[in-house]
Amino acid sequence: MLTTDRLVNTLNLELLTGEEGLDRPIKNTDISRPGLEMAGYFSHYASDRIQLLGTTELSFYNLLPDEEKKGRMRKLCRPETPAIIVTRGLEPPEELIQASQETHTPIIVAKDATTSLMSRLTTFLEHELAKTTSLHGVLVDVYGVGVLITGDSGIGKSETALELVKRGHRLVADDNVEIKEITKDELVGKPPKLIEHLLEIRGLGIINVMTLFGAGSILTEKQIRLNINLENWNKNKLYDRVGLNEETLKILDTEITKKTIPVRPGRNVAVIIEVAAMNYRLNIMGINTAVEFNERLNEEIVRNSHKSEE
């Protein structure tokens, strides 16, 4: 559970008052700037969000009659409010401090500009409060592309990852990949702390990739862009030989590109995955070899049909 205390420590913010409320949970990634509330409109006050008070809000507040100031701040400090942050190093109003002491609402001061701090907070909250899941597989950074290797147990996922590491790529997680959906279409995978940097090879045991290959051979987390699913070669199955068929794998609410690679003796799976990663990058750049080949093939068919008619 994300609490105000963790927010303060992670972002190096300064707590002014309301220490008793540091254990309040933060459940919302949205941040509020209570401008209308300063004017007295609390009908739709999002009290469960972190509140930011910048120059605009406080300059308006200072124009209020003295008899209204205390009531506004008391309404602002609710039991469910995680924190009220005063930005730009501004001095918090005395009425706010009093309301904080009465309701134990944490008051935090920051030197950052309001917009800059809002950006930092949003990034932090989206990461911490993102939806999570875990998958059985191996995550490797191949040419800058986060490749999630999946398949049945014993198919050779870890051995393939070891070969990729030897070829200069970086291991993120083996066996169990913890996945967070940071935003729409952005999945980030990382290993559980218990098996960080470790790789299990049947017949050899558990090896520490960072110790064997150096710090450049591992990553703590990586955005997942491509899924390579390994399966035993099935002679009765028609595999994609051109690349026009687009498969996807849905993880949480995000779909990523999926490629199914049949495995049998003599196939260098690590090299195939390298080529798949490079080809994925080309596709992002708008270069699709399969589509170009299909267009050339259609043009050739049209030319031949015209010749036969003549």
Swiss-Prot record:
What does the record give as cofactor? Mg(2+)
- Per UniProt, where does ATP bind? G151, D152, S153, G154, I155, G156, K157, S158
Q: What does the UniProt keyword field contain? A: ATP-binding, Carbohydrate metabolism, Kinase, Magnesium, Metal-binding, Multifunctional enzyme, Nucleotide-binding, Serine/threonine-protein kinase, Transferase
Domain of life where this protein originates: Bacteria
Segments for region (Important for the catalytic mechanism of both phosphorylation and dephosphorylation): 199-208
Query: Which residues are named in the active-site annotation?
Result: H136, K157, D175 (proton acceptor), R241
**EC number(s) on record?**
2.7.11.-, 2.7.4.-
Q: Name one GO molecular function term.
A: protein serine/threonine kinase activity
Example GO biological process term?
A: regulation of carbohydrate metabolic process
User: Which CDD domains did the record assign?
Assistant: HprK_C (cd01918)
Positions of region (Important for the catalytic mechanism of dephosphorylation): 262-267
Amino acids binding Mg(2+): S158, E200
| The keyword Nucleotide-binding appears for this protein | yes
Q: How does it assemble?
A: Homohexamer.
As for family, the record states: Belongs to the HPrK/P family.
**What is said about the domains?**
The Walker A ATP-binding motif also binds Pi and PPi.
The record, for HAMAP family, names:
HPr_kinase
Misc: Both phosphorylation and phosphorolysis are carried out by the same active site and suggest a common mechanism for both reactions.
Biological function? Catalyzes the ATP- as well as the pyrophosphate-dependent phosphorylation of a specific serine residue in HPr, a phosphocarrier protein of the phosphoenolpyruvate-dependent sugar phosphotransferase system (PTS). HprK/P also catalyzes the pyrophosphate-producing, inorganic phosphate-dependent dephosphorylation (phosphorolysis) of seryl-phosphorylated HPr (P-Ser-HPr).
Protein name per the record:
HPr kinase/phosphorylase
Q: What is the lineage of its organism?
A: Bacteria, Bacillati, Bacillota, Bacilli, Bacillales
Gene name per UniProt: hprK
